[in-house]
């Protein structure tokens, strides 16, 4: 190939021998199934692999008769099995959440074989055509782990590596390559015809040759990964390479040639070698081995196994665990908070249970500012989290980040709320949550969420219910999502003075990766419509500004707040009202800039993330008299800071220019340090 391929799956030779099929995860690009031309090394992307795994990317199998590639998605959770038709380019789902990997195609009966992991047990399964279900052939004991399944070209033999406990108690596990008859394995008989080990080294990626006479694989037997050949008829094992850096995952061709993966700095590189047995192998020396030989006493520095430590004397009590009854004080600290334009001082207490299921936070502060009414100088807030439920209450709620404006979250009066979060789909990278919240406010002077809008009523009831969906992916080394989509749909209602004003809001964002590493283009869209009279503040949404404070928290929306539906950089906060709205934003995420040594060990910058965006907004679409158009264009750059190697922070700088009739547009500058 003309470039390094990054991580690479198992590879297959096309029926005519002109191409090699594999799944790759390039540096800076999302994972794809690709076709590699053997003539010129040209790489053609065929299909994105969602939920790719680390070094193996996906489990891949090939049916040359029907030109079909079988592959797995969501490899880090409950694997799906999908099929890609190479003729049409279309992919279809075969088995969802099947948890089957190490798949291999059996040309004898068109079945797929694989290894399924469930509840800690590995089982050999067979997936007969048309691949709508599986049959369990054998379940390994819990202390056995099988991997690297393969079938001979005629389908009569199966090979796999099996890691099992050592021969003596406490001895290290041993990995053995086993060759079995498939007809016996189909009946649950796992007696091997042949078996071999490679000492303490782990054999990896052993596959059958095209004539079925040999198995080729790799192992760190000498400390460097080399290719080895096992001959079934003589049961002899021989090295066929002597690499300086390492060869991996051989693909046997006709005769004695192999396509192997050579290790390089940016990933694996396909390399052609001749498989000639050799005894000229160079071993490398390990510092740990030399240290143990020089100082034999270190060989006894072995941590005891958990089973040898008696835990019964440490049990204080037994029975059902009730998180709320286990709450205890975790922290009690002094705090400074902002309330509108005043400063309050007080304390904050945090309680939690040892397992982290429940938490309770209580904040209290006092603002000695005589410019405030006396009843607004005391600030109290409490919030409680229990599994999917949250509840809270506040009196003149204050916020630390209000000290650093321009966005203010403090509210006069009292309020209480109850929230609920139910995960409907949790299959990363795909998630779907149902969210609901009801709240009541009393003694208001401004509308919650809109600091520059006077509330038409002192007392206000709000209710929200909706869904949030996420399906985004990123390449290795990414600093942000690079492809995929997100969406949300939320129903909202205000209740005040006997009136109920409902509204409906939806968003949809879709991103596409660019050939430039770690670069993508996103189209972000949103719309909202509300009932009620246009003159009623409760019937309107209000947009404007970046929304970041000079010092801020990720809990308030993250650094990239310009992406929010109600953000509109280049305009003042809440400057653009609308009873209905339609908003589009086009965003280009540029490749990050990485710094090798910018800063000191205690505080340094690891990367910078530049972004460009342009947006357009239409409000009150169904009213000619009040319809308004606004546009903006801007840029933001985020610097990832690390403090004491452990605490990440984000320093963001942005600028935007707004355009709208009536002189509402401004040039807005933003500087924000996200500390948590």
Which sequence ranges carry the predicted segments?
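Outer-membrane beta-barrel initiation region
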Residues: 1-10, 14, 24, 268-269, ...
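A flexible loop/linker signature enriched in serine peptidases of the S9 family
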Residues: 3-6, 23-34, 49-56, 65, ...
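Short coil/turn segments that connect the beta-strands within blades of beta-propeller domains
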Residues: 16-18, 65-67, 108-110, 154-156, ...
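Short loop/turn segments that connect beta-strands within beta-propeller blades
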Residues: 37-41, 85-89, 128-132, 182-186, ...
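Conserved blade-ending motifs and adjacent loop-strand segments that build the rim/top face
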Residues: 194-205, 236-254, 288-289
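Transmembrane beta-strand segments that form the barrel wall of outer-membrane beta-barrel proteins
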Residues: 319-341, 345-370, 391-399, 403-405, ...
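Solvent-exposed loop/turn segments connecting transmembrane beta-strands
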Residues: 336-345, 352-356, 364-378, 410, ...
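C-terminal outer-membrane beta-barrel translocator/porin domains of Gram-negative envelope proteins
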Residues: 395-396, 406, 419, 446-614, ...
């Amino acid at each position: 190939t003309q470039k390094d391929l990054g991580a690479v799956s198992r590879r297959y030779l096309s029926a005519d021998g002109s191409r090699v099929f594999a799944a790759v995860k390039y540096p800076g690009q999302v994972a794809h199934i690709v076709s590699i031309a053997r003539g010129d090394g040209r790489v053609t992307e065929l299909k994105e692999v969602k939920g790719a795994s680390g070094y193996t990317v996906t489990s891949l199998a090939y049916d040359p008769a029907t030109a079909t590639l079988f592959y797995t998605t969501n490899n880090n959770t409950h694997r799906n099995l999908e099929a890609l038709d190479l003729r049409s380019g279309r992919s279809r789902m075969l088995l969802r959440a099947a948890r089957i990997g190490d798949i291999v195609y059996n040309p004898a009966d068109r079945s797929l074989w694989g290894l399924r992991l469930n509840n800690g047990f590995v089982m050999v399964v067979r997936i007969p055509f048309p691949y709508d279900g599986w049959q369990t052939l054998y379940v390994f004991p819990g202390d056995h782990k099988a991997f690297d399944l393969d079938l001979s070209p005629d389908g009569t033999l199966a090979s796999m590596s099996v890691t099992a406990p050592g021969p003596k108690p406490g001895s290290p596990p041993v990995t053995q390559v086993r060759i079995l008859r498939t007809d016996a394995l189909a009946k649950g008989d796992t007696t091997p015809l042949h078996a071999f080990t490679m000492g303490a080294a782990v054999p990896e990626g052993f596959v059958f040759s095209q004539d079925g006479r040999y198995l080729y694989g790799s192992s760190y037997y000498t400390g460097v990964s080399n290719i080895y050949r096992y001959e079934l008829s003589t049961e002899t094992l021989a090295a066929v390479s002597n690499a300086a850096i390492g060869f991996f995952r051989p693909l046997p061709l006709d005769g004695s040639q192999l396509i192997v993966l050579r290790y390089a700095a940016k990933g694996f590189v396909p390399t052609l070698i001749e498989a000639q047995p050799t005894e000229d192998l160079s071993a490398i020396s390990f510092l740990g081995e030399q240290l143990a030989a020089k100082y034999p006493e270190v060989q006894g520095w072995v941590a005891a196994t958990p089973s040898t430590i008696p835990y019964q004397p440490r049990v204080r009590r037994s029975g059902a665990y009730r998180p709320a009854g286990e709450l205890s004080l975790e922290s009690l600290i002094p705090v400074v908070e902002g309330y509108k334009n005043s400063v309050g001082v007080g304390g904050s207490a945090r309680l939690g249970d040892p397992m982290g299921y429940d938490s309770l936070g209580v904040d209290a502060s006092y603002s000695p500012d005589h410019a405030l009414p006396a009843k607004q100088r005391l600030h109290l807030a409490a919030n409680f989290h229990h599994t999917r439920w949250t509840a809270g209450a506040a009196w003149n709620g204050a916020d630390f980040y209000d000290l650093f404006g321009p966005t203010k979250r403090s509210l006069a009066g009292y309020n209480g709320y109850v929230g609920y979060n139910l995960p409907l789909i949790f299959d990363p990278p795909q998630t779907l949550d149902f969210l609901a919240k009801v709240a009541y406010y009393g003694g208001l002077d401004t509308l919650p969420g809109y600091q520059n809008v006077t509330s038409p009523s002192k007392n206000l009831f709000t209710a929200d219910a909706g869904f949030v969906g996420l399906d985004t992916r990123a390449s290795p080394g990414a600093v942000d999502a690079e492809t995929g989509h997100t969406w949300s749909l939320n129903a909202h209602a205000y209740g005040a003075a006997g009136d109920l004003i409902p509204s409906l809001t939806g968003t949809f964002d879709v991103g596409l990766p660019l050939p430039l590493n770690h670069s993508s283009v996103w189209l972000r869209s949103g719309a909202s419509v509300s009932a009620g009279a246009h003159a009623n503040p409760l019937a309107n949404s209000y947009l404007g500004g970046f929304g970041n404070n000079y010092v801020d928290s990720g809990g308030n929306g993250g650094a990239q707040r310009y992406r929010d539906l109600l953000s509109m950089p280049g305009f003042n906060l809440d400057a653009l009202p609308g009873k209905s709205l339609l908003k589009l934003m086009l965003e280009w995420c540029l490749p990050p800039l990485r710094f090798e040594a910018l800063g000191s060990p205690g505080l340094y910058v690891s990367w910078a993330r530049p972004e460009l965006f342009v947006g357009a907004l239409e409000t009150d679409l169904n009213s000619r008299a009040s319809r308004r158009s606004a546009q903006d264009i801007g840029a933001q750059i985020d610097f990832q800071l690390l403090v004491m190697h452990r605490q990440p922070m984000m320093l963001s700088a942005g600028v935007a220019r707004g355009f709208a009739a009536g002189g509402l547009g401004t040039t807005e500058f933003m500087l924000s340090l996200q500390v948590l």
